[in-house]
C-alpha cells in the first residue's frame, strides 16, 4: 500500500524537516527499492504481488503499475489505514487464483533495508504462526502478515480503533 509520490502529499511529516522536494525524492527512491524487492519475489514465483494506491485515479494507477511491471493493483478507497488494509485483504482474496491457499503480507514502502529474505522468512514463519508483526522503532510495524488459516476463520481483523501514525500502532494491533 502506498501513496502516489506527488509533491507536497507524500512523506508529509518528514517534509516539515527536509522540505517537500527532498521528501518527494526520498519517497520515489524508497518506492523504487520496494518494487525492486517485490518484483524479485514475484519473478522467483515466491508470491503474488499486489499494490494498493491512493492519491491518483484508476487510469493513472494502471499506467504507473504497467510501467513498474505490476499486474495486480487496486485503489485503496476511503477510510483509515485499517479499513483500507481490510478492504485489500478481501479484494486480494476475491481476485486471486489460489484464494484459499493464500497468506497475506503487508509491507511498508518506506523500508530502505527491505530485502527479499524478509519476505521469504515471513512466508516460512506463516507455516506455524497465524499473525506476524515486524515491529518498528517508532511504535508501529513495518510488516504485518496473516496466514490463510487465520484469514479463512476470521472476518474480524485487528485493524479497528487503532491510532494510526502514532507510537501506539503496534500496541493497539
Describe each PLM feature range.
Residues 135-136, 141-142, 146-148, 155:
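Active-site rim beta-loop-alpha module in soluble metabolic enzymes
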Residues 59-102, 163:
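Short phosphate-binding loop-to-helix
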Residues 25-44:
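A short, N-terminal amphipathic alpha-helix
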Residues 112-140:
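Conserved donor-nucleotide/metal-binding helix-loop-beta segment in metal-dependent transferases, i.e.
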Amino acid at each position: 500500500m502506498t501513496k502516489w509520490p506527488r509533491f507536497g502529499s507524500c512523506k508529509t511529516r518528514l517534509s516539515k524537516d527536509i522540505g517537500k522536494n527532498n521528501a518527494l525524492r526520498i519517497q520515489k527512491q524508497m518506492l523504487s527499492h520496494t518494487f525492486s524487492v517485490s518484483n524479485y519475489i514475484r519473478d522467483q514465483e515466491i508470491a503474488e504481488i499486489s499494490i494498493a494506491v491512493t492519491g491518483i485515479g484508476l487510469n493513472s494507477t494502471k499506467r504507473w503499475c504497467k510501467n513498474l511491471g505490476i499486474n495486480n493493483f487496486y485503489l485503496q478507497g476511503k477510510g483509515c489505514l485499517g479499513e483500507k488494509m481490510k478492504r485489500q485483504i478481501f479484494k486480494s482474496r476475491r481476485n486471486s487464483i489460489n484464494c484459499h491457499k493464500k497468506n497475506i503480507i503487508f509491507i511498508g514502502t518506506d523500508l530502505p533495508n527491505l530485502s527479499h529474505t524478509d519476505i521469504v522468512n515471513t512466508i516460512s514463519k506463516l507455516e506455524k504462526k497465524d499473525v506476524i508483526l515486524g515491529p518498528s522503532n517508532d511504535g508501529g510495524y513495518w510488516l504485518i502478515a496473516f496466514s490463510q488459516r487465520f484469514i479463512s476463520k476470521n472476518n474480524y481483523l485487528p485493524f479497528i480503533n487503532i491510532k494510526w501514525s502514532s507510537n501506539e500502532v503496534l500496541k493497539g494491533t
